[in-house]
């Protein structure tokens, strides 16, 4: 029987604990807040995230970081992206060369512009780089928790490590594919949250299906451009962590980032919307990171630039859409000269 420790009792950590426990895995779920851990122990429900979900008694809940770390050599990191480094630094003394790390949260660190697996690699010097991977794809926590059919991708630099992640997480309800392009998987799975905000804005101002289709298609093109500039395999963006994750995040009522964009379109300020949301919308901070990555590498990402201007420069959504629609004419498969070489 495989064992795993999940760090983070948010919606994804909670959903994954139920999924893995249902598959017969030994699961330890680490919660930062004692009151959350106490409530889960008492009621078998997380009071804040997915409160309707019944958490099996076989899931061991703890707030003791050392105890959680020592319970398994496979650690699933489900804390919010901008908190990952801090949590990892607290865990570092308990890591060793036999530990495997799986990034479950999606995002790009604001200060360093590193992906989640890169942050883990930066912090955990005692863990070999090829033992650090990610599990990404079109997978809303609500549906995974309910056991609805879902497909994701396990990415690790070494195929054997990717296969190990696949073996632990895969069940008849969660199909897991493998990929060794960790960078491409993480860029696709993170940058799509920026496009989801744009999709929500489009929904909020009732631009219709044509606009949404254009947004998803051209959004994928700019994510792929960024990925190629960073050295990712362009084929990855045609997979689950690329177009798959982009479609579900832009279309689903479960998407926090799409919802945030919809609320922004009503004239609310970003602070107002965030204060009203109980759960983290990773796309806000990821917008800063993707915008800065694109600038640093000279990659044109007009939709990302528009979302950045709306969120942080108080630009009108309608005016930014007009700017996008009146850009100079281009070939559909246009690429910067640097990416054609």
Curated annotation (Swiss-Prot):
GO terms for cellular component: cytosol. Keywords: Cytoplasm, Lipid biosynthesis, Lipid metabolism, NAD, NADP, Nucleotide-binding, Oxidoreductase, Phospholipid biosynthesis, Phospholipid metabolism. GO terms for molecular function: glycerol-3-phosphate dehydrogenase [NAD(P)+] activity; NAD binding. NADPH binds at residues 11-12, 32-33, 106, 141, 256, 280, 282. Pathway: Membrane lipid metabolism; glycerophospholipid metabolism. Catalyzes the reduction of the glycolytic intermediate dihydroxyacetone phosphate (DHAP) to sn-glycerol 3-phosphate (G3P), the key precursor for phospholipid synthesis. This is Glycerol-3-phosphate dehydrogenase [NAD(P)+] 1. It comes from Salinibacter ruber (strain DSM 13855 / M31).
């Amino acid at each position: 029987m495989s064992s795993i420790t999940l760090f983070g009792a948010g919606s994804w950590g909670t959903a994954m604990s139920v999924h893995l426990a249902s598959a017969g895995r030994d699961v330890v779920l680490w919660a930062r807040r004692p009151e959350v851990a106490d409530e889960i122990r008492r009621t078998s429900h997380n009071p804040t995230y997915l409160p309707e979900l019944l958490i099996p008694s076989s899931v061991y809940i703890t707030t003791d970081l050392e105890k959680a770390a020592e319970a398994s050599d496979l650690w699933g990191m489900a804390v919010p992206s901008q908190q990952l480094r801090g949590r990892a630094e607290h865990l570092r003394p308990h890591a060793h060369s036999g530990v495997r790390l799986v990034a479950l949260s999606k995002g790009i660190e604001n200060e360093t512009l590193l992906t989640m697996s890169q942050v883990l690699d930066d912090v955990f010097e005692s863990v070999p780089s090829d033992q650090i991977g990610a599990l990404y794809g079109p997978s809303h926590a609500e549906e995974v928790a309910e056991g609805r059919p879902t497909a994701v991708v396990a990415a690790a630099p070494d195929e054997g490590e990717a296969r190990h992640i696949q073996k632990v997480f895969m069940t008849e309800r969660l199909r897991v594919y493998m990929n060794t392009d960790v960078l491409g998987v993480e860029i696709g799975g993170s940058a799509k949250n920026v496009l989801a905000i744009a999709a929500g804005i489009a929904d909020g101002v009732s631009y219709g299906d044509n606009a949404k289709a254009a947004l998803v298609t051209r959004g994928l093109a700019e994510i792929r451009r960024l990925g190629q500039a960073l050295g990712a395999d362009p084929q990855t963006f045609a997979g689950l962590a690329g177009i798959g994750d982009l479609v579900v995040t832009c279309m689903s009522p479960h998407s926090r980032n799409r919802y945030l964009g919809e609320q922004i379109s009503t004239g609310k300020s970003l602070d107002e919307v965030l204060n009203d949301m109980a759960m983290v919308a990773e796309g806000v901070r990821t917008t800063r990171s993707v915008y800065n990555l694109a600038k640093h590498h000279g990659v044109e990402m007009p939709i990302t630039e528009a979302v950045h201007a709306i969120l942080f420069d108080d630009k009108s959504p309608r005016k930014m859409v007009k700017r996008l629609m009146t850009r100079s004419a281009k070939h559909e498969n246009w690429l910067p000269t640097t990416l054609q070489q």
